[in-house]
Amino acid sequence: KDEAERNAVLGAAYFQRAYRYYKLTHQFGDVPYLDKEITEPKLDFYSYDRWSILEQCKKDLEFAYQWVPEVQPRGRANKDACGVLLMKICMAVGDFDRAIAVGKEVVGRHPLMTGRFTGNQTKPNTNLMHDLHSVEAKIDMSNTEGIMYVVAHPTTTPLDKDNRIYTMRNALPYWAKGGAIKTPDGKTGTAIAPDEADKNTEIDND
């Protein structure tokens, strides 16, 4: 409709691309870089220097940080999500002064929570830290610490319960599958849920 809206959409797309390339360059180093849509078979990809990719991502994120709105529907990239990624890429390329400046701006808009704020505050043996790491905290609009969320609402329907998103699946490979990693005494070494013996029914809210 206008330049601001166009730039906001473009900035959000730049964020998504920069996020992927930030992870790719840190995991693999030099990788192929695509700056346009591929609409037909292509076999002649070649790698770009990781630092040139990160510098391009930094440029794109400066644009995104300027144009993407502060307030967005949950699950979408907002100004401060762009700012956090910009800060990380600035540190990756050695622009520490810019990283500090952006970091201060983001922190200034997201003060730490200092008081109880979810329905869990009535549970015994809980505190603010429990609130912050609860499911409820991630959908509570009064939570000033939240910057960008992965939206997934657990359901009570047995057939639908596995449609929710597990945070670990977004951050790491599925290393708990099938109990492949064992302890020296043969017990499961990694799991996505606590052992029944370790659960506290008074405070666990999964």
Give residue ranges: language-model regions:
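Aromatic-anchored glycine-rich loop motif in surface-exposed flexible loops
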Residues: 1-77, 93-98, 108
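An aromatic- and glycine-enriched ligand-binding surface/loop that stacks and positions planar moieties
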Residues: 80, 86-206
